[in-house]
């Protein structure tokens, strides 16, 4: 059978989006891996599935697969594309929608200026909820990586993140430390790794090594996690701007117990069909 799909991106973090509300198909990890190959498939960072909800209190179910076939809990840039997609496809007329993810319920708002705001919910900082192996909760942790001690913050935005502060974003050890921390045994579900350079109290630069995808042009949950880490440690103030290789996100967080708000663009690239 042929399935209609849309190619989208949020600041260069690119997605294949499938409407499984009006189309019916059983998508498996092998399909994500096959379609995700940039040489022999469609090519993307993540596959986003738009499904009818299981929960009557939400509008849609949102599932996410990495290009290696692994299913993940959350994707912030994908959430903005999800909101743009369901409105463009007339799956809803609402400008504010509630979406069920593997990592919890999020709220999406399409603003009059075309930007999309996502209420990502409160961050999780308790180690076992991230999950991260630590004796007790702290603002930062020391991690032994090949005999080198690395200082990092650990945050869950529905998916696990480690955040490291660096002095030079261009020479950050994204491709050397990134995969080692991703697979570190103290992160039992693996982890996304953010390298954060604080420019001033309102602006920072960020590069992210994404679990199962490698370095991407942008990572929405990574930007949220970096903002939480920076505000928690007194480096920055809310609201703040985070510049990623693909562009800029605005993040707001009022502190523990409060939701993280992320605002940025979502862009449709093309429509296509793929054989299942």
Curated annotation (Swiss-Prot):
Residue(s) at site: Could be important to modulate the pK values of the two catalytic cysteine residues: 161, 210
Residues at which substrate binds: 13, 46, 66, 76-77, 159, 192, 210-211, 220-221
Assigned EC number: 5.1.1.7
UniProt-annotated site: Important for dimerization, residues: 270
Pathway: Amino-acid biosynthesis; L-lysine biosynthesis via DAP pathway; DL-2,6-diaminopimelate from LL-2,6-diaminopimelate: step 1/1
Keywords of the record: Amino-acid biosynthesis, Cytoplasm, Isomerase, Lysine biosynthesis
Entry superkingdom: Bacteria
Disulfide bonds: none
Xref: PROSITE patterns: DAP_EPIMERASE (PS01326)
Database matches in SUPFAM superfamilies: Diaminopimelate epimerase-like
UniProt-annotated location(s): Cytoplasm
DNA damage recorded as keyword: no
A single MF term (Gene Ontology): diaminopimelate epimerase activity
A cellular-component GO term for this protein: cytosol
Biological process annotations from GO: lysine biosynthetic process via diaminopimelate
Chemical reaction(s) catalysed: (2S,6S)-2,6-diaminopimelate = meso-2,6-diaminopimelate
The protein's enzyme class: isomerase
Active-site residue numbers: 75, 219
Assembly mode: Homodimer.
Function per UniProt: Catalyzes the stereoinversion of LL-2,6-diaminopimelate (L,L-DAP) to meso-diaminopimelate (meso-DAP), a precursor of L-lysine and an essential component of the bacterial peptidoglycan.
Recorded family membership: Belongs to the diaminopimelate epimerase family.
PANTHER family: DIAMINOPIMELATE EPIMERASE, DIAMINOPIMELATE EPIMERASE, CHLOROPLASTIC
Name of protein: Diaminopimelate epimerase
Higher taxonomy: Bacteria, Pseudomonadati, Pseudomonadota, Gammaproteobacteria, Pseudomonadales
